[in-house]
């Protein structure tokens, strides 16, 4: 659907699991003081190991993405006489991707970003110590065809650090221990996924595994039509309707819901979970994960910016939008920035997150049925944490699903990422979710102080690393730690995103414009 002079929801770039969106207003991080007289610690025996890039190109989804991308350079390529000046509001991945494809099609794209950094949900900046602070913890799945194709076209595939084909979970009932789904090379989907689950002996019993499979068979046979029909059900309602074991919720679905939408499974539409599962189950390398080898600003956003600028486009930072000024007939006359500058273009694209779009809609548009659909969408808050410790914690070179009441996923970035590598100290990056009643949480953590959030997180880490986290009087949640724990927190950052991805609650999929645009 194309709206005159405005294309809403520009090219939506698929990003990683812990998925913070474009956020014009973020709380800047706080830092605990460094302990410069800390004792010397032994280096970790764990060595970062990257794996060869999987064959992500050999899927129908990738081929389709590649064909669509190539069409901008060929069949959709504008004649020089038809070249248009396009203003893009928002410099997240959506805005950068939109500018890239418009440049391929021969148009002049200019991005107007409100903040002083690009990337939106993948933005990053340096603190006073020179350490990088990221808006969100991101990984890249093999089943992200648009992003994989983008990396190929930008010639930056070598910046992805592919990890072993596994999914790693913390064991709630066995603090300090982990278990995994191991994908055996050479076995095609969906059999590799099924075998990985069958081989794991710590999460579900064999009867529970057998009981889980039948409700998912219609998804494989009927595909998206069955998936879309489940939108009226939450994850937990779907489980009970189809007789799935209750423990599948505790063992798997809670982790999936919090990773996909920062929300508890009793609040999340089953369509979201089934859509992800269907993609992963149908692509042999779909669940293999990669980390970016450094900060997202330099390693991802900069090559996208360079690509656009080399083709005549431009990027404007610190250029927040004040108003979309319309003509009497409702068409756009110009954009008005907060600086007072007027921006005139032939076409205008919104690459803003839904809550910002709702605030910026001109009065003439607000009662249009198309835009009224935005009323149904509300962003979910999420918090991203960086925590530097004075020594190495027990770590894995991978993403970990914490299965914690407060934490979604985390990674020891000193092990998983080349730029952040440190043989002596751990730096954990964690996604704190759910953090509001809307998402199923009991506490509005977005309204809490940074110190309260970190203290609660230290309590969860004490459970995950019971023999390693020290009893530290700075953090009351660690007061029950025994004498063996030695690791203390040196520094932290707290990045709050009050409005993140929209809440995909049951019954909203068929009503909203995003489902219409994707069909």
Residue ranges and their predicted role:
Residues 83-111:
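N-terminal Rossmann-like FAD-binding beta1-loop-alpha1 element of flavoenzymes
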Residues 120-143, 220-221:
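Glycine-rich active-site loop/strand segments that organize a redox cofactor
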Residues 49-75, 397-401, 406-519:
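Conserved flavin/dinucleotide-binding core of flavoenzymes
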Residues 103-128:
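Glycine-rich FAD pyrophosphate-binding loop
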Residues 274-347, 351:
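Helical element adjacent to the flavin cofactor pocket in flavoenzyme catalytic cores
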Residues 147-148, 152-153, 157-274, 282:
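Mobile amphipathic helical/loop "lid" adjacent to a hydrophobic cofactor/ligand pocket
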Residues 1-33:
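N-terminal chloroplast transit peptides
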Residues 60, 82, 319-441, 451-465:
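Mid-domain catalytic core of redox enzymes
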């Amino acid at each position: 659907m194309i709206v005159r002079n405005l294309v809403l929801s520009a090219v939506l770039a698929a990003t990683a699991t812990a998925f913070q969106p474009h956020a014009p207003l973020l709380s800047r991080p706080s830092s605990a003081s460094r302990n410069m007289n800390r004792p010397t610690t032994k280096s970790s025996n764990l060595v970062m190991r990257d794996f060869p890039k999987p064959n992500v190109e050999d899927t129908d989804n990738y081929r389709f993405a590649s064909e669509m991308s190539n069409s901008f350079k060929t069949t959709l390529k504008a004649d020089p006489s038809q070249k248009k000046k396009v203003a893009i509001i928002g410099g997240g991945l959506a805005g950068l991707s939109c500018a890239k494809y418009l440049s391929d099609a021969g148009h002049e794209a200019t991005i107007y970003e409100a903040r002083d950094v690009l990337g939106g949900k993948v933005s990053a900046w340096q603190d006073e110590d020179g350490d990088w602070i990221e808006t969100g913890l991101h990984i890249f799945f093999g089943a992200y065809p648009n992003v994989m194709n983008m990396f190929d076209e930008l010639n930056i595939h070598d910046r992805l650090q592919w990890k072993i084909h596994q999914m790693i979970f913390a064991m709630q009932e066995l603090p300090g221990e982990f278990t995994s789904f191991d994908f055996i090379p050479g076995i095609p989907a969906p059999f590799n996924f099924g075998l990985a689950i069958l081989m794991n002996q710590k999460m579900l019993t064999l009867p529970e595994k057998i009981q889980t499979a039948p409700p998912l068979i219609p998804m494989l046979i009927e595909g998206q039509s069955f998936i879309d029909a489940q939108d009226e059900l939450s994850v937990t309602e779907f489980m009970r309707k189809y007789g799935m074991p209750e423990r599948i919720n505790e063992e798997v679905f809670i982790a999936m819901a919090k990773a996909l939408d920062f929300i508890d499974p009793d609040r999340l539409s089953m369509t979201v979970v089934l859509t992800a599962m269907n993609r992963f189950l149908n692509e042999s390398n779909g669940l293999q994960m990669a980390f970016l080898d450094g900060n997202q600003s330099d390693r991802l956003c900069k090559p996208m910016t360079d690509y656009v600028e080399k083709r005549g486009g431009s990027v404007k930072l610190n250029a927040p939008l004040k108003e979309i000024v319309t003509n009497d007939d409702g068409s756009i006359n110009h954009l008005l920035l907060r600086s007072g500058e007027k921006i005139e273009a032939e076409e205008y694209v919104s690459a803003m997150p839904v809550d910002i779009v709702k605030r910026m809609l001109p009065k003439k548009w607000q009662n249009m049925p198309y835009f009224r659909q935005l009323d149904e969408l509300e962003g979910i808050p999420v918090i991203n944490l960086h925590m530097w410790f004075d020594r190495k914690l027990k770590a894995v070179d991978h993403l970990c699903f914490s299965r914690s009441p407060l934490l979604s996923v985390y990674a020891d970035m000193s092990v998983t990422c080349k730029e952040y590598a440190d043989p002596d100290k751990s730096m954990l990056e964690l996604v704190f979710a759910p953090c509001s009643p809307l998402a199923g949480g009991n506490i509005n953590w977005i309204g809490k102080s940074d110190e309260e959030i970190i203290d609660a997180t230290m309590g969860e880490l004490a459970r995950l690393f019971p023999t390693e986290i020290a009893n530290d009087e700075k953090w009351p949640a660690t007061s029950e730690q025994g004498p063996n724990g030695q690791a203390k927190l040196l520094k932290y950052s707290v990045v709050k995103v009050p409005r993140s991805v929209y809440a995909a609650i049951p019954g909203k999929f068929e009503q909203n414009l995003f489902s219409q645009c994707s069909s």
